[in-house]
Amino acid sequence: MNQEIRERTKWFMNDRFGMFIHWGLYSIPACGEWVMSFKEMTVEDYRPYFEQFDPVDYDPKKWVRLAKEAGMKYVVLTAKHHDGFCLFDSKLTEYKATNTKAGRDLVREFVDACREEGLKVGLYFSIIDWSHPDFPKYGDRQHPMRNNLAYKDEQINFDRYLDFMHGQIEELVTNYGKLDLLWFDFSYDNMTGETWRATELIKMVRKHQPDVIIDNRLEGAGDNHGSIATEHPLIYSGDFASPEQIIPPHGVCDVNGEPIPWELCATMNNHWGYCNFDHQYKTPQMLIRKLVECVSKGGNMILNVGPDAKGNIPEESVKILQEIGKWMKKNKDSIYGCGISRLEKPDWGRYTQKGNAIYAHVYETPLGALPLYGIAPDKLERVTYLADGSIVNRGEAWNTALYTDVAFVSFGEDPVFTYPLPDEKDTVLEIHLKE
């Protein structure tokens, strides 16, 4: 990882936890953000959603406050998704929120809300556009018209599309103040790298926003990292990898074994955009543990919400974030600024580490005392509960005498007895070692 990327991503690798917001016209049919493609809808089929779009409850301040209460440090909004509809006031298209019943620039209000609450500002932009006449259609495996023979011999001017796409990105990086993160989406097949005139694009972005961090999807996607982890990453390889709906088994490292920045993007249920029949929500416990897993492997987690057509985040998502927030309020020090521990993963949970501070994330109730693998008894000064600072009892007893190379702690008075964990989601212990 070069020094420029290291400097740019310092805040990102410190903050660790963000909110993704997928919101657009697709919230009206309420069956996910890919509805136009899955149902092979024409632009004309999709047009009624543009006419209907009227987010009367849109209040980005509520969204951002919810993110902040959950312990999230940055928020990324879909300024434009694959359907081509813009939440911002682009001068290059009429297909935008200002021409709907909303009648205003929804991105402007979002970035203002983030800054007001002190959160980092991120914008997602789809480099794919299913509504643009010069984007490839027939035979493109993602496009709604991929099977429509009417487009088989269509003549398009792809450079005209690229001029348009670059122009819209330039609007975002020049009209909305300092941006902290740009999330491009996505490359596939031969639609990658210089197909997007990616070098030209990155140079333009860096001219206006030299410190913005950028994902790797001008070259890769959720199924590959592109050249970011190679000996010679390309100029458009990005500042961080973006695994989707999966946590890399060993984190993400370059060819020399050095960890590089990465971010898991994950949904709360099984859709990014609002889906009124998808109630398969992950539990707060699971999501907390997945965040910890990401941090323990040197990564971030950006967790998605999909507001409905009126602009309301589903109540299930709100409740989950509130529960995560309760845990984060007490245990945030084991997340922010933390990363890979020098200790191996224990069978009862995970370790995270920040400098010499080691945090044990305990998921399973131990039978008797809890072994702190990798820590010798004579090196341990004390262990405290991170949630309240109280002392955790030492757990060495007659039945641990054989295991002299491992320190033990107990969750109750008698180290031989079994006690319930104080926090069944994740009990965090702060381990203080002797200097």
Describe every region a protein language model picked out.
Residues 1-435:
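Mature catalytic domains of secreted/periplasmic carbohydrate-active enzymes
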